[in-house]
Amino acid sequence: MSKRDFYEVLGVDKTADEKTLKSAYRKQAMKYHPDRNPGDAEAEAQFKVVGEAYSVLSDPNKRAAYDRMGHAAFEQGGGMGGGQGPFGGGGGAADFADIFEQVFGEAFNMGGGGGRRGGRGQAGPARGSDLRFDMEISLEDAFNGKDETIKVPTAMNCERCDGQGNEPGTELETCGTCQGAGRIRRSQGFFTMEQTCPQCGGRGQYVKTPCNDCDGVGRVRKTRTLNVTVPAGVEDGTRIRLAGEGEAGARGGPRGDLYIFISVREHEIFERDGPNLYCRTPASMVQAALGCTIQVPTIEGGKAEMKIAEGAQTGKRMRMRGKGMPRLRGGPRGDMIVELFVETPRNLCDRQKELLKEFCDLSGEGCNPDSAGFFNKVKQFWDEVTTDDGRPNAG
């Protein structure tokens, strides 16, 4: 007896993506589930065929083999190895239970980092998934702290059925295969093995009349609006945990958590290193030579006075204590380190040039000790590598 085409079994075309396959399997599995069709051998057989089709088409390798060779890929001598079958060896009810659990138990298990707790195949409540939200703020926001309103797409308990999955006014049905235990025992020779119930996926109950709003899942996708307080002192990469603000749990389980990941934008003036701030400030050649008091910007938005000593050079660093960032866990503020760079005058008029030349003529080595020392070293170097007549010294 020839087998039906797996794509035909699920009612999809050969270009169907993973989402389409899962939706089609879910629809067919609910339709032919044995607990919905008690005593119907034909429905039970079709339920297994649907599971077999999905197990092949949802696996990229098996699907590729099936597309090339059809059902022959899983028969004796086929491309998947002699006699393996689409389930890779074991086969049977446990594999259908795995598929059923994967599709129905994790229908809303998206994103975040938590996932469900308690393990597959266990009846009862399951914790919702954790969620991640990325928030970009300015350096000023990191200094002052801020309150932000965010919108987070998440799975929430269906209001119509209160997260139970069944249409209001109907009851969850006890699984007839495991009698509500969620697990069954099978004997193989001298051994007795316990496994997840293949009919209810380990829940012990099943939804006979699905809720019209959530289609029996118990959760729906919605966008939540939350108020988030970003504390002063947060750094780039800081993670803020909002307990219980993640995905809704399954079957009355607790919600997961929401994690806010902070990203601090680069600033035009300041660079940050932990609690300390760095900025570069210009000074004229005259200011640097004679010394002066200049005004430098602060992260608060104001200005602070800083004294420049006489003869300051480019690269000189000066520390302003307590003018940096607040610390997230308390304690004194960091410092602001100001780095000086001396500007060389440009676009000089003739008179300015004359004055600079006059200044240069009056300057002695004492005015430019670094330059004098450098040129003395150069002269000494040339004396060592050349002869008296200017030729390179062979020695």
UniProtKB/Swiss-Prot annotation:
| Record localization | Cytoplasm
Q: State where Zn(2+) 2 binds.
A: C175, C178, C197, C200
CXXCXGXG motif repeats by residue range: 158-165, 175-182, 197-204, 211-218
What CDD domains does the entry give?
Answer: DnaJ, DnaJ_C, DnaJ_zf
Q: Name one GO cellular component term.
A: cytoplasm
Print the keywords alphabetically. Answer: Chaperone, Cytoplasm, DNA replication, Metal-binding, Repeat, Stress response, Zinc, Zinc-finger
SMART domains (UniProt xref): DnaJ
Task: Give yes or no: UniProt keyword Transport.
Answer: no
> Could you tell me the superkingdom of the organism this chain comes from?
Bacteria
Instruction: Name the coenzymes or cofactors required.
Output: Zn(2+)
| Cofactor note (record) | Binds 2 Zn(2+) ions per monomer.
Keyword check for Lyase:
no
Zinc fingers (CR-type): give the ranges. Answer: 145-223
Q: How does it assemble?
A: Homodimer.
| Free-text comment on this protein's domains from its UniProt entry | The J domain is necessary and sufficient to stimulate DnaK ATPase activity. Zinc center 1 plays an important role in the autonomous, DnaK-independent chaperone activity of DnaJ. Zinc center 2 is essential for interaction with DnaK and for DnaJ activity.
Function per UniProt = Participates actively in the response to hyperosmotic and heat shock by preventing the aggregation of stress-denatured proteins and by disaggregating proteins, also in an autonomous, DnaK-independent fashion. Unfolded proteins bind initially to DnaJ; upon interaction with the DnaJ-bound protein, DnaK hydrolyzes its bound ATP, resulting in the formation of a stable complex. GrpE releases ADP from DnaK; ATP binding to DnaK triggers the release of the substrate protein, thus completing the reaction cycle.
Record-given protein name: Chaperone protein DnaJ
